[in-house]
Amino acid sequence: MAVPNELKYSKEHEWVKVEGNVATIGITEYAQSELGDIVFVELPETDDEINEGDTFGSVESVKTVSELYAPISGKVVEVNEELEDSPEFVNESPYEKAWMVKVEISDESQLEALLTAEKYSEMIGE
């Protein structure tokens, strides 16, 4: 199962890619495989504020609905609108086409609480 080294991970199975003061957030390959076929993705609006640990959307699969938890706090600067029409991208390409939101980071110290790829792999038993 892919766990890219350049990303950071939350214990709730979100990944974070940091570029400058913007973090791109999505769900991991492990999370999508546990959920099964994704049929709907609900995301926040651009300019919404999200707070670390709070829900910022949900992913609905044929099995269940799973909340998305913000791994960091910040202002949503971009939302992946393609997921509205193509939620299957979450299954097909969780780290590329299925990024969910881009957030302007409000507290960089929150990044320190995220897991490295190695620690995340250990957590999921890989």
From Swiss-Prot:
A GO cellular component annotation in the UniProt record: cytosol
Modified residue annotations for N6-lipoyllysine: K63
Pfam families for the chain: GCV_H
Keywords: Lipoyl
GO biological process, one term: glycine decarboxylation via glycine cleavage system
Keyword Zinc-finger among UniProt keywords: no
Coiled coil: none
Domain of life, per lineage: Bacteria
Cofactors demanded by this protein: (R)-lipoate
Residues of the Lipoyl-binding domain: 22-104
Record keyword rRNA-binding present: no
Annotated SUPFAM superfamilies: Single hybrid motif
Cofactor, free-text remark: Binds 1 lipoyl cofactor covalently.
Positions of disulphide bridges: none
Gene3D superfamilies with a match to the protein in the record: 2.40.50.100
InterPro entries in alphabetical order: 2-oxoA_DH_lipoyl-BS, Biotin_lipoyl, GCV_H, GCV_H/Fam206, GCV_H_sub, Single_hybrid_motif
Subunit note: The glycine cleavage system is composed of four proteins: P, T, L and H.
Family of this protein: Belongs to the GcvH family.
Primary role: The glycine cleavage system catalyzes the degradation of glycine. The H protein shuttles the methylamine group of glycine from the P protein to the T protein. Is also involved in protein lipoylation via its role as an octanoyl/lipoyl carrier protein intermediate.
Full protein name: Glycine cleavage system H protein
